[in-house]
Amino acid sequence: MSTTGKGGKAKGKTASSKQVSRSARAGLQFPVGRISRFLKNGRYSERIGTGAPVYLAAVLEYLAAEVLELAGNAAKDNKKTRIVPRHILLAIRNDEELNKLMANTTIADGGVLPNINPMLLPSKTKKTSEAEH
């Protein structure tokens, strides 16, 4: 006879034991199982260690949180409540380390950083400043 039946409990398991995802065990929001599957199917290596997808998920989650925080600040500076690609671009390009990481990346609808050569700006001379007073 089977150890499990209608209304029966599985052998060796208690009623309170549930499956806990690897993301939950690691305290992450990013899907460790999906990243593990991508690493295996991507044929990056013959074998993938058990800690590799957890570590990669943690790194990706940290980078996403960092970019979102800076983009949120950029949106707030522009008095907007919604993050758009322009805010993401401003966040990345104004952060030295993220700019280095994403140096060759183009963000669609991001535009460019505002930059005017100081030589092209009108210079303030003593005559104009005295005339204002």
UniProtKB/Swiss-Prot annotation:
Family: Belongs to the histone H2A family.
GO CC, alphabetical: nucleosome; nucleus
Presence of keyword Cell inner membrane: no
Cross-link type Glycyl lysine isopeptide (Lys-Gly) (interchain with G-Cter in ubiquitin), residue numbers: K124
Cross-referenced InterPro entries: Histone-fold, Histone_H2A, Histone_H2A/H2B/H3, Histone_H2A_C, Histone_H2A_CS
Quaternary assembly: The nucleosome is a histone octamer containing two molecules each of H2A, H2B, H3 and H4 assembled in one H3-H4 heterotetramer and two H2A-H2B heterodimers. The octamer wraps approximately 147 bp of DNA.
UniProt xrefs under Pfam families: Histone, Histone_H2A_C
Signal peptide: none
Modified residues (N6-acetyllysine): K6, K9, K11, K13, K18
Disulfide bonds: none
Function: Core component of nucleosome. Nucleosomes wrap and compact DNA into chromatin, limiting DNA accessibility to the cellular machineries which require DNA as a template. Histones thereby play a central role in transcription regulation, DNA repair, DNA replication and chromosomal stability. DNA accessibility is regulated via a complex set of post-translational modifications of histones, also called histone code, and nucleosome remodeling.
An annotated Gene Ontology molecular function: protein heterodimerization activity
Record-listed Phosphoserine modification sites: S123, S129
UniProt KW keywords: Acetylation, Chromosome, DNA-binding, Isopeptide bond, Nucleosome core, Nucleus, Phosphoprotein, Ubl conjugation
Compartments where found: Nucleus; Chromosome
Region (Disordered): 1-23
PTM notes: Monoubiquitination of Lys-124 gives a specific tag for epigenetic transcriptional repression.
Name of the featured protein: Histone H2A.1
Post-translational modification N-acetylserine, affected residues: S2
